[in-house]
Amino acid sequence: MKIVISSDIYYPMINGVAVFSRNLAAGLKKRGHKVMVIAPSITGEFSVEKDPEYGFTVARLSSNRIHVYPDQINKVPESKDFFGLKLPKLFYKNGLNVSLNCYSEVRQVLDDFEPDIIHDQTPGPVALAVFRYAKKHDIPLVSTDHAYPDNLTQQLKLPKPAKKPINSMMNKYFVSFLKRSEYATMPTEQAVADLIPNKRKPFKVPVEALSNGIDLSRFAKGQPNKEIYDKYNIPRSKPIILYVGRVDPEKSLDVLAEAFTKVAKKKQDAQLVIVGDGTAKPKLESILEKADLSEQVHFLGRVVGDDLPQIYHTGSVFAITSKTETQSIVLMEAMASGLPCVAVKAGAVHELVKNNKNGFLANPDDANSVARNILKIIDNPKLREKMSKESVARAERHDISHTLTRMEEIYQEVLANREREL
């Protein structure tokens, strides 16, 4: 098949949508399909290139920077200190790239590629252009929704009274995108239920819960290389609470920082390792500096390549306090690495973390609850080993090979339905 994967967010950005889109393209290419990814350019200039590692085609659309949000590629600039307060940046030189008026370029690359099917990942400007082309040329569409409206509205820092109506409006907007396609997927059953709560009302298109999946072999449990500790200044033989992911407001990492202050009082050699970068970092630094814990906290920034699996293996427990996860690729990576996990009872993480099995589910926004559950694991080596094995076992059902097989079946079903209609 000739498959197009379109997204407004793509590698080298590091987030769930970007990682999944590239993994999907690479996996489909490896299975013999001809694949093109369409996404905004990171330089602003239009180009068509080959992925340097996997060899599929990437069409980079002309783009403009939005300077109120960082690009998730470069290091977020350090916050300014103002009379002891750390102030976050309000203007980012390396802003997020967005392709607003991109239909002519989309038409150009798709005319040349002649796709059999298009699979969109984000309800943004690139999708609008791709949908327009698909409708005009009668090309079947598949859509995947990766986000809750909360993921976006929290970035806007809206007053509380405005959040509910805007979330409702954005929910309808997300649903409208799914309805334009012929088949839709979301990463979990919970994500489907939250976006489409009215089961009695028939939905226009089939919607299936299908895991994003990960390459399990990349994160298989093992001992980290000694060099990784020195390279990232990670202490050896100490309890390490690990977080990997964006350091942005909707991830609720202030709760994890507060929880760590409580863990450190009872476990004085405990360390917090945060892999990732984002706009919430100044707030975390302030919390941890006030608690005099800066020496026990390690902000590693963005880590990619072979170092990332090694860093997972340094951890004692993986902690994620976000309430807005539609699945969480980093949680699956942690599980595949054999880490017990502490998450919160919100979003869809309960489909990955089973309470008292491979970790614990704490109360949302409750640092005391998060701290108690972290301490249960690091204070009990036997429990930690038991939960480690359970994490690996539960991760196995999320191998990306299962996702790729089902996605191929969906594409074939959609194409077969089109042929029957002719």
PLM regions and their residue ranges:
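Aromatic "clamp/platform" in nucleotide-sugar-dependent glycosyltransferases that forms part
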Residues: K323
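A conserved mid-protein helix/loop that constitutes part of the nucleotide-sugar donor-binding site
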Residues: V19, P239-K262, L272, T279-E285, ...
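Conserved acidic donor-binding segment of nucleotide-sugar-dependent glycosyltransferases
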Residues: N355-N356, F360-A367, K376-K382
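Short hydrophobic beta-strand element within catalytic cores of glycosyltransferases
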Residues: P340-A343
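Short alpha-helical donor nucleotide-sugar binding micro-motif in glycosyltransferases
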Residues: L110, L178, R302-V303, Q310-G315
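N-terminal subdomain of nucleotide-sugar transferases
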Residues: M1-S62, T405-E408, Q412, E419-L422
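Donor nucleotide-sugar binding/catalytic pocket of nucleotide-sugar-dependent glycosyltransferases
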Residues: A39, A59-S62, K164-N225
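Nucleotide-activated donor-binding/catalytic signature segment of Leloir-type glycosyltransferases, i.e.
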Residues: K283-V303
